[in-house]
Amino acid sequence: MFSALIPVSPLNAVKTRLKDFLTPDERIELIKNMLLDVYEGISPICDKIYVVSKDKEILEFLKPYAVIPIMETENIKGLNDALNYAFNYIEEDNIIITPADIPLIKKENINNIVKECKENSVILCPSRGGGTNLMVLNRSSIKTRYEGFSFLKHIEECKENNINPIIFPSFYISIDINTVEDLGEILIHGGGTYTYNYLKKLNINAKPKHSSAGRFEVIRQNTE
């Protein structure tokens, strides 16, 4: 049996690197749409889905969905503390940890990943920036070491516990959304997702570039 655990930061602090491109309310709607894409990608595979957050609004938003909310207490500091706190509420042996900002994740990705799972194994999917965008583990196998270059930290943690981690590179899972350029990946590869449709609603588009300056430019059209 597999469960999924999705940690979500307080909405007033999400995606600050997009603050010059999206308003605070737009950034909140962006994270909600990305979260729905992640939910749709993992829900066909997982027996239960847990979301851990300090934010009442995000947990309230998820009430119509088959999600088990876990409200963090005020004394929890950081992502690893939040995950360890959430583990106390999870009954399933195998846990898929995934962030809320990888909206290109697909059911097929999760299917292929869980097929690799063995007893007491750890599966790691790296992000483009050195982080860990998805991890499958038994809660007793290793400690989570998110923040910074967590992909390398998790490999080190596995070695310290005599576990040979299974590395599962995935283009779609590797794309997390933090910058304006990241939005372009959704506009190119994410047709049909909640996130894609939301960006289009905001009149945001990706314009191809034919130079060494980059593959594309993300623009927002003024409709006034």
From Swiss-Prot:
InterPro entries: CofC, Nucleotide-diphossugar_trans
Disulfide bonds: none
Molecular-function annotations in GO: GTP binding; phospholactate guanylyltransferase activity
Pathway, per record: Cofactor biosynthesis; coenzyme F420 biosynthesis
Known role: Guanylyltransferase that catalyzes the activation of (2S)-2-phospholactate (2-PL) as (2S)-lactyl-2-diphospho-5'-guanosine, via the condensation of 2-PL with GTP. It is involved in the biosynthesis of coenzyme F420, a hydride carrier cofactor.
Xref: PANTHER family: 2-PHOSPHO-L-LACTATE GUANYLYLTRANSFERASE
Protein name, per record: 2-phospho-L-lactate guanylyltransferase
Species in which this protein is naturally found: Methanococcus aeolicus (strain ATCC BAA-1280 / DSM 17508 / OCM 812 / Nankai-3)
Gene transcribed to yield this protein: cofC
